[in-house]
Every structure is written in C-alpha cells, then in structure tokens.
Amino acid sequence: MATAIPKITDQFHSAQDIGWYGSSYLLTNSCLTISFGKLYTLYPVKWIYLVALALFEIGSLVCGFTPNSVGLIIGRAITGLGSAGLFSGAITVISQSMPLQRRLLCISVIMCLFGVADVAGPLIGGVFTDYLTWRWCFYINLPFGGLTALAIVFLLEAQQPVKQAGGIKCLLSHLDLVGLLFLFPAVICLLLVLSWGGADYPWDDRRIIGLIVGFTALILVFIVVQWWKQDKATVPPRLIKKRDIWGTSIFSFCITGAMMAFTYHLPIWFQSVKGVSATKSGLMSIPTILGMTICSLLSAVLVGKIGFYTPFMYAAPVLSVIGAGLLSTLKVDSGPAQWIGYQIPFGIGLGIGLSQPMVVVQAVLEPDDIPLAIAITAFMESLGGSVAISVAQSVFRSQLVKNMALEAPQANAHGNITTAMTTLRDTVPPEMLSGVLRAYNLAITQALYVGVALSSLAIVGALPIRWTSVNEKKTEGCP
C-alpha cells in the first residue's frame, strides 16, 4: 500500500498516522507468527489456516470500507494478525503433504511469490490508486481469499496434529502467554526506537533512552521466561541452540531485511528523483522481479539435483551485496543502463537465497519440530523486514533534512519539499530543482546503505549451516 499512502492521507488528512499504517500490520504479524506455529502443532493445519485466512479477510474488509484513519489502522492490525498464520501455514501444508525432495520447487514458488509480491505490490497499488481508488488495494484480497478458502475446505485433508492440545489450560500453557506479554511490547519499543531515533528525536532524548531501556528490560525478561518454559516456550531453547536454526534465523532476518529496504525505497527514488508515476515506478522494478523469479525456480531445481542448499546460501549474500552496493551509487542523471543493470545481481541474489531457510529447517529437524521452526523462520523474516524499513526510513528522513539544508536551503520557502516527493517538479522553482533532486537522491541512497549492510551480514547466518543433503534420509536433528 506504499504507493497509495499519499491519496489516503489526502482523503483522511492524516499525515501524522502514516507510520502506523505499516507499523500496526508489522507489529501483530511479527509478534504472533510463532504463536500460529504452535497452533499448527496442536491442531489440524487446515482449520487453523482457515482461521488465519478469515482474520486476514476481515482486516481487508475493514481497511476497504473504513471512513477514517483510525479504522484503517485497526484494519491493518487485524490483517497482520491473519497474515501471521498464512505464510507459515502454507509452508507447513507443503511439509506435511510431500517428501522433502518434492517440496523444494513448491517452497521456491511460494518464496518467489512472497518476494515478487513485495516488489510488484507498488506497481499494482499504483494502478489501483491512479485509475480506481486506493480502497481496491484491500478489496482485491476479498475474492482471492474466498477462492482460497473454498480450495482449502474441499481439497485439503485435515491431518492429525503432531501433538495433542489437551484442555484450555494446556493450550494456554503451550501458547506461552507470559512470554508474549513481554515480547509484544519489546518489539513495539524496538520499532519505535528505530523509527524515531535520529529523525523525530535525537538519540539522547529521554523518550528514546526510555524506549531503549524498556526494550532491553523486556527482552531480557522474555529470554528468562523462554528458559523457564523450555519446550512450552514461544521459542524453545533446544531449537534455537541448534546451529542450523540460529544460522537460518540470522540469514532470514538479513536477506529479507535487505529486500524490504530496497523494495520500499527504490520506488521512492523512481518517483521523486526520476519524476515518474506510481505505476511506472513499479514497472521500473521489473528487473528485480525477473531476477528473483527465474533464479528462485532455478535454484530449487539445482538443489534437488546436487542435494545441497549450502552453496546457494553462500552465493546469495555475495550477489545481493554487489547489486545493493551498485544501486546505492545511483545519481540523479543515472540512466536505464544503471538502474536496470544494478537490479539484476540484486534480484538474482534474493532469488537464490530467500527460499533456502525453509528448506534447511525441514532437512535437519524431526517432523514434530518443523511447524514451529517454520514459524520461527517466518518471524525472523518479518522482524528483519520491519527493522530494515524502520531504520532505512529513519535514515532517509533525517538525511533528507540535512541534505536539503546543504543543497537547496531556500527550497522549503516554496512548500514543504521534504514531504512533496511526487510533485517536486511542480512545486520547486526551476533554478532550485537540481539541488532538491540531489538532496533527495543522496538521502535515498544513504537509506539504501541499510540494505547493503544487511546483504553483507547474511553471510554470517550462512556460515554455520551444515552441508546436509536433501537427497539423503534424515535420521536425526542437528546437534
């Protein structure tokens, strides 16, 4: 919905709520993903998946018909709650339906669609916003969700869960409500620190310091609770201590964070610096989409042939950091050769890397642990995207103000130039336009450094991964 936000704020007069349109979704999604993973181990996947889908549809309905900004925020939170169970549920269905060798292509297709949706979303949202209404960004979910529900009801068998939930007391114990009580506010504190620090408030402001202290205290208590609860914890210590699991967690956090930092800010560069429409900015992101799609499917075939996913986890950070580094060098006068060519290695790196963590957890763990491990991996992906967007957006906002003061100090006299991203050529006098464009270009490329850093750090998560063959029958989990 990024390309729809300007129209939404125009209608609701709610520029102050922009951050909450994304944060309300990310908060419920991040914090409840693992809880859905627990539910998938206690109840038939079919029915829990349908509950998650129903929540997602209800949230979309609220967003589409809301008369005000508060309703949109509430709808986004409900949508995030539902989506927390959809992604991990889809992977769990595949893991229970076919042998590992046959899952590779299916997982790659899902991860590919996940990545393509993040890149193509601005394109589709731009088309709806430009030619229909921003509300169609949410209406479109309703028919597709209905068709999915029908397919699940009639085509998916309700298999027995790997564990029995028992009574309500046992269920609540497995869901680790005590742990969630500390995890949820900890994530809120973290995202607020990363969003506000250096942009809305200086880092030594008492509000930022208070949030940092709050996050530290809450996450420490959460860790203690996890150690105390053991197998009934939100994140069981015996799982996270396995090198393959903590390695894939780091890898997922970094590679997804890198993708989100670029898919969020590259369209801003196209629209503000190049002056194109929301629709065209989506079209200009097609090189990334093609690289991801082709290489995700190709890597699945190759992993099935050679049996090992580890080489692809090594190659993904290398290729993505090359592309990310090149994209961070874009200039105001960069042409198609640059912005197309630089996206290709970045898209290839994402394509061969995004699906591998889901393959790893299924190759090294026993069936009873797979649904929860999938949810943990999905949680790290969601958290990585949330953190990357928050940090990159904070960098962009703070650096734009500084750069504007250096490149075009008089520009804001002609309007609030730091918020008029898509109308710069209509708002800024011709003699000041070049300075304003340089300020925007520099601020965006500085924000892209977040994606460059995360792409390079993904190798830290890849190195601990063992060379386990998907073509050999696994007899035990990882040490």
Curated annotation (Swiss-Prot):
Gene: lnaF
UniProt-recorded name of the protein: MFS-type transporter lnaF
SUPFAM superfamilies per the UniProt record, alphabetical: MFS general substrate transporter
Chief location category: membrane
Keywords of the record: Cell membrane, Glycoprotein, Membrane, Transmembrane, Transmembrane helix, Transport
Role noted for this protein: MFS-type transporter; part of the lnb gene cluster that mediates the biosynthesis of diastereomeric piperazines. Lna and lnb clusters encode sets of enzymes that produce overlapping sets of previously undescribed metabolites such as piperazinomycin-like metabolites or morpholine. The lna and lnb biosynthetic pathways appear to be part of a signaling network that controls the formation of sclerotia, a resilient overwintering structure. May be involved in the secretion of the metabolites produced by the lna and lnb clusters.
Glycosylation (residues): N416
Molecular function GO labels: transmembrane transporter activity
Membrane topology summary: Multi-pass membrane protein
Family indicated by similarity: Belongs to the major facilitator superfamily. TCR/Tet family.
Subcellular location: Cell membrane
Organism the protein comes from: Aspergillus flavus (strain ATCC 200026 / FGSC A1120 / IAM 13836 / NRRL 3357 / JCM 12722 / SRRC 167)
